[in-house]
Amino acid sequence: WRASAPSPQAWLKDYTLARYGTSNTAAQKAWELVRNSALNCETSLQGPHEAVFCARPSLTVDRVSSWGGTGIFYDTQMMVGAAHNLLAAQLSGSNYSYDLTDFSRQALTDYGHQLLASINEASKSQNEAEAYAKRRDAYLQLMLDLDELLSTNENFMLGRWTNMARGIADEAEGTTEADRQ
């Protein structure tokens, strides 16, 4: 326990040292950007905003689940900056790999929200057919890019989580063979 609250900057400096095993200015800057954006919600939310790619297909998605947030409450360019800063840190290790994947994923999914809104706008006008097609193709490519990014870290791969669930089902009393499939 501490006698007084630490300054956020000092805490983040200690956190990045503990997380990555080295002091790194770019990593500290990345976390400072995340602290001032995605981790700095100043309003009450029932749930966080969710990746638009997880919603049922629609041009007017405002949430993925019934409890999800309806908008992004932070400057999305700060997450882009966080991903760039963490990449520039050029560290190694599983924590660094996880965070770099996660920050990049968040920046790309935030862009997906913006891109879908622009696709919706372009779809409303016959004069925007070419813009619509370009944005649609960019959106579909963004999904593929996200899949490729997430496949670089086992923590973001579905197989890891389904295997863990199957392992738990094998241990639990009262499960049937069908439960374990």
Can you annotate each of these PLM segments?
Residues 1-181:
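Substrate-binding groove of N-acetylhexosamine-processing glycoside hydrolases
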